[in-house]
């Protein structure tokens, strides 16, 4: 029987991937200290910290960068105390002395994982001039026959994304700010050539005080192209099967 893949929205920029028996979580141990987005749902975190449920004993934990709304050290420490994890990809520059094994990438920034999965990274600067000194690690995942690209809070630097021109990308995960910017949309269309776009890193609708959802829907209506499929992820459980 052919293996099926699954990508699931947890909250904010947290995405769970599963292919066969291999489980990966991206930016899933975080805390919204700035109160601009939504917290990791309490029931989800309680299960994780006890080593129970679908998000227990994840094989790989990946983090795009060191901001609290993507990576929260106390949560990682507690998770590792109660769960078995095969590998970590910590934020660039993070000095970690806790439990866990860091993944070793080759010179091309690539590493093979079980079940034919390939993980690759691209480092770009963080969005917003005040955060340009923060390195954001984008993750490209070849999983089954699909190629997923997670941009985290990556900035719209054409010269950075030129490094992965030609890599197949079936679905890209971007912030509403990236999609809102003309340079961001140019990267998606002309460099990455991607037709399925998931706008994530959004608060839950009832907590969206800055109206990110309204802005994004307006942008889709105004700037979207006929051959593009753009969807919003702002509820736990939204998913893609492949």
Description of each model-found segment:
Residues 1-25, 29-34, 38-42, 218, ...:
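Zn-dependent metallo-beta-lactamase
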Residues 13, 32-33, 66-71, 94-98, ...:
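Active-site environment of divalent metal-dependent phosphoester hydrolases
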Residues 17-20, 113, 141-144:
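Active-site beta-strand termini and strand-to-loop segments that position acidic
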Residues 22-62, 74-78, 129, 155-167:
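Pre-active-site segment of Zn-dependent metallo-hydrolases
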Residues 25-27, 57-69, 88-92, 149-154, ...:
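Active-site neighborhood of phospho(di)ester-bond hydrolases with catalytic His/Asp-centered motifs
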Residues 48-111:
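Active-site HxH/HxHxD metal-binding segment of metal-dependent hydrolases
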Residues 99-117, 163, 186-242:
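Binuclear metal-ion centers of metallo-dependent hydrolases, dominated by the metallo-beta-lactamase
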Residues 127-191:
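Active-site-proximal loop/helix segments of hydrolase catalytic cores
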């Amino acid at each position: 029987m052919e293996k099926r893949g699954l990508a699931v929205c947890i909250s904010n920029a947290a995405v769970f991937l599963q292919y066969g028996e291999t489980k990966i979580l991206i930016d899933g141990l975080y805390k919204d200290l700035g109160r601009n987005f939504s917290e990791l749902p309490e029931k989800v975190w309680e299960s994780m910290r006890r080593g129970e449920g679908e998000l227990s004993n994840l094989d790989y934990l990946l983090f795009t960068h060191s901001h609290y709304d993507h990576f929260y050290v106390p949560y990682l420490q507690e998770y590792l105390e109660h769960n078995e994890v095969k590998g970590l990809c910590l934020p660039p520059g993070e000095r970690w002395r806790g439990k866990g094994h860091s993944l070793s990438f080759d010179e091309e920034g690539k590493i093979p994982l079980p079940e034919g999965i390939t993980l690759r990274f691209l480092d770009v600067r963080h969005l917003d001039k005040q955060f340009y000194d923060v390195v954001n690690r984008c993750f490209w995942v070849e999983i089954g026959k699909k190629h997923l690209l997670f941009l985290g809070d990556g900035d719209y630097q054409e010269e950075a994304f030129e490094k992965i021109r030609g890599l197949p990308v079936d679905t890209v995960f971007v912030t509403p700010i990236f999609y809102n910017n003309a340079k961001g949309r140019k990267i998606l269309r002309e460099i990455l050539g991607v037709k399925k776009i998931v706008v994530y890193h959004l608060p839950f609708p009832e907590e969206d005080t800055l109206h990110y959802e309204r802005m994004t829907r307006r942008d889709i209506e105004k700037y979207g192209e006929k051959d593009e499929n753009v969807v919003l992820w702002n509820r736990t459980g939204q998913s893609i099967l492949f």
